[in-house]
């Protein structure tokens, strides 16, 4: 007679097998009723023997108790976004850039996939068992949604098959099929619950439930599309090969993934998917096109927050017609005057749209737009609504001309338009309340100075009450002054003051980004900080010197140079430093002057370390003159292999690069 442990093992194995056939192979071999019977049998046995329940049991998908809030998970490998193209010409230009950058006659093949309209997630398996899952978040840090992801039946709690890596992080999309979406909304209308505008919102709402039991009731599903972390194992050297391997291990992969041998085949794939879009049963908003060869991907690399080897080819956005009620003018952080059409509300691609950007005066002229016109609205990239054209054949008799302002609608300063630029700008600078508000909101934002609790409404009140004129004024605020604001009690006020004090300790890159210099984003700010090292060196840099920084051209260099040439900007910076804003001095290391076995060497760490964290090891190696790289190449001098070292170790051995273990690293660090 079988033992209880044997019965449980057999039931779990059988259920996992049928989940694989149903969700991955799309070829169920037993009726739903039989699956339900097996699940009931397993559940009854586990109820009688709770000490034998395992985390990867199929019964554990039902969800645990509600969470008070989501904790954060930092992505070991950033979850990057993709650049978009919207027409054939743009895709062909991307194709040419790839061919030119590779600078070889080697053929490029493309792996083409559906661009699912859901939520990007990262799922980590250790020794084949699901241990954590996270949202994309800001690409660096996401929310811990492990409990909710465990309830999605398409996602295996345990991988099956051979040669499963010690650590494998898969990336993919959680989405809601249209039938499931309609059922959720039907139930919500019947019970008076929340009705979702589209399947993506419903998927997001379902996945971000603090109560996993609610998520478990939603028919979410999942497709894999990539890998993040890989340790203690190997994967094929093509993107398609990796997806096929995922499928062998039990991970669901779309059956529409296609290998294309040319740009013409990619375009044919795009048009076929566009034709089939209405019958897929789930929402997509384009196709994703990736260089299939991992070696070529590595050669192409990345720019800022996106890879050079992949692109999202978006479908034409959905369009609707409505009327323009009025045109208003908004003033942005850098003084840009943006006309905004106020519309008769209309649903476009599942979202109620009441405003649409008109971009600038040239666009209004191009459209021939008048207030009262009937217009076609498009959600560009399915995100930002814009006016596509005016329906001239249905123009009402009482339309009015759109008059672009010559004075700022907020502060009354002159509006000027520099020759060669499409954007008109308010010349008021920080005397303009709108610019001041937007500049301050940018300054305190999470990726800039990161002042916790300093929201938009607080900034609005501070500017309106004339408490704050420049960023430096923020650090002069007291709890007493803040308490006078709406919805700001003594405790909240003190929390903001404490957050401002904490924010004084920053990095040079964050500080530069926070200043809001035109066209200086996070990546450019980081590049400037790394290249010049000190504020003094950057302030003194010429336009020619600035252009030596990677990705800084004449336009950005001019903006940076002009910013520091402006006396009022230098005064604000001096005030900020006087208020105590500071960052660590740059560490300048001359490898030739360091007596260390690591000095001047390019070192790669792989696998997990037992005696110190990887960040601590990196910091110590840098102190000793090493350059720590993220991947193995012919330029690598040394690889330090910890536990469960994977493909990096294999590549090092293949290239004949010196490899040492953690014990030897510690010995050398101690010497």
Swiss-Prot record:
GO terms for molecular function: DNA binding; DNA ligase (NAD+) activity; metal ion binding. One of its GO terms (biological process) is DNA replication. It catalyses: NAD(+) + (deoxyribonucleotide)n-3'-hydroxyl + 5'-phospho-(deoxyribonucleotide)m = (deoxyribonucleotide)n+m + AMP + beta-nicotinamide D-nucleotide. SUPFAM superfamilies: BRCT domain, DNA ligase/mRNA capping enzyme, catalytic domain, Nucleic acid-binding proteins, RuvA domain 2-like. DNA ligase that catalyzes the formation of phosphodiester linkages between 5'-phosphoryl and 3'-hydroxyl groups in double-stranded DNA using NAD as a coenzyme and as the energy source for the reaction. It is essential for DNA replication and repair of damaged DNA. Pfam families: BRCT, DNA_ligase_aden, DNA_ligase_OB, DNA_ligase_ZBD, HHH_2, HHH_5, Nlig-Ia. The active site is at residue 115. NAD(+) binds at residues 32-36, 81-82, 113, 136, 173, 290, 314. Its EC number is 6.5.1.2. It comes from Escherichia coli O157:H7. One of its GO terms (cellular component) is cytosol. Its cofactor is Mg(2+); Mn(2+). This is DNA ligase. Belongs to the NAD-dependent DNA ligase family. LigA subfamily. Keywords: DNA damage, DNA repair, DNA replication, Ligase, Magnesium, Manganese, Metal-binding, NAD, Zinc. InterPro entries: BRCT_dom, BRCT_dom_sf, DisA/LigA_HHH, DNA_ligase, DNA_ligase_AS, DNA_ligase_CS, DNAligase_adenylation, DNAligase_N. It is an enzyme of class 6 (ligase). Zn(2+) binds at residues 408, 411, 426, 432. Residues 593-671 form the BRCT domain. SMART domains: BRCT (SM00292), HhH1 (SM00278), LIGANc (SM00532).
């Amino acid at each position: 007679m079988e033992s209880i442990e044997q019965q449980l093992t057999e039931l779990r194995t059988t259920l996992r097998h049928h989940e694989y056939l149903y969700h991955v192979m799309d070829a169920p071999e037993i009726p739903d009723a039989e699956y339900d019977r097996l699940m009931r049998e397993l559940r009854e046995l586990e109820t009688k023997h709770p000490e034998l329940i395992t985390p990867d049991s199929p019964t554990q998908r039902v969800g645990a108790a509600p969470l008070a809030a989501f904790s954060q998970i930092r992505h070991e490998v950033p979850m990057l976004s993709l650049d978009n193209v919207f027409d054939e010409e743009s895709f062909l230009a991307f194709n040419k850039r790839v061919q030119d950058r590779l600078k070889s006659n080697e053929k490029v093949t493309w792996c083409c996939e559906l661009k699912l309209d859901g939520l990007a997630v990262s799922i980590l398996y250790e020794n084949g068992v699901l241990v954590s899952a996270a949202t994309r978040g800001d690409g660096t840090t996401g929310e811990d949604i492990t409990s909710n992801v465990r309830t999605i039946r398409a996602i295996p709690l345990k991988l099956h098959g051979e040669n499963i890596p010690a650590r494998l992080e898969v990336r993919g999309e959680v989405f809601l099929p249209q039938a499931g979406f309609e059922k959720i909304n039907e139930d919500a209308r019947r019970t008076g619950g929340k009705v979702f505008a589209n399947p993506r919102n419903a998927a997001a709402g379902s996945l971000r439930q603090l109560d996993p039991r609610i998520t478990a009731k939603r028919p979410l599903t999942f497709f894999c599309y990539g890998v993040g972390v890989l340790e203690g194992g190997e994967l094929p050297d093509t993107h398609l090969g990796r997806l096929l391997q995922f499928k062998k291990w039990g991970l669901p992969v779309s059956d529409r993934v296609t290998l294309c041998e040319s740009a013409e085949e990619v375009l044919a794939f795009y048009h076929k998917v566009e034709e089939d879009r209405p019958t897929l049963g789930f929402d997509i908003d384009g196709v994703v096109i990736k260089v299939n060869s991992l070696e070529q991907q590595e050669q192409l690399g990345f720019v800022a927050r996106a890879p050079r080897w992949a692109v999202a080819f978006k479908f034409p956005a959905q369009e609707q017609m409505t009327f323009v009620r009025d045109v208003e003018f908004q003033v942005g952080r850098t003084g840009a005057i943006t006309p905004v059409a106020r519309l008769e509300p209309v649903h476009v691609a599942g979202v109620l749209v009441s405003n649409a950007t008109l971009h600038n005066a040239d666009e209004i002229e191009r459209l021939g737009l008048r207030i009262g016109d009937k217009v076609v609205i498009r959600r560009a990239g399915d995100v930002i609504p814009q006016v596509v054209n005016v329906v001239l054949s249905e123009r009402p008799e009482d339309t009015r001309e759109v008059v672009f302002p010559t004075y700022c609608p907020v502060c009354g300063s002159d509006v000027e338009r520099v020759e060669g630029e499409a954007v008109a700008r308010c010349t008021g600078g920080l005397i303009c309340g709108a610019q001041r508000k937007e500049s301050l909101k940018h300054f305190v934002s999470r990726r800039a100075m990161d002042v916790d609790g300093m929201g938009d409404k607080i900034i609005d009140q501070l500017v309106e009450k004339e408490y704050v004129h420049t960023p430096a004024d923020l650090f002069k605020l007291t709890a007493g002054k803040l308490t006078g604001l709406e919805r700001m009690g003594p405790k909240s006020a003190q929390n903001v003051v404490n957050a401002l004090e904490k924010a004084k300790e920053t990095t040079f890159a964050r500080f530069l980004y926070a200043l809001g210099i035109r066209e200086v984003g996070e990546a450019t700010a980081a590049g400037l900080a790394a290249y010049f090292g000190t504020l003094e060196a950057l302030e003194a840099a010429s336009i020619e010197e600035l252009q030596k920084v990677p990705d800084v051209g004449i336009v950005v260099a001019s903006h940076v140079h002009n910013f520091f040439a402006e006396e009022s900007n230098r005064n604000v910076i001096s005030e900020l430093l006087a208020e105590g804003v500071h960052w660590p001095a740059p560490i300048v290391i001359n490898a030739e002057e360091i007596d260390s076995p690591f000095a001047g060497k390019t070192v790669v760490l792989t696998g997990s370390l037992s005696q110190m964290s990887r960040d601590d090891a990196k910091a110590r190696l840098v102190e000793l003159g090493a350059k720590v790289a993220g991947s193995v190449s012919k330029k690598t001098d040394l690889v330090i292999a910890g536990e469960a070292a994977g493909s990096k170790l294999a590549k090092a051995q293949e290239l004949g690069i010196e490899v040492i273990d953690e014990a030897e690293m510690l010995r050398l660090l101690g010497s």
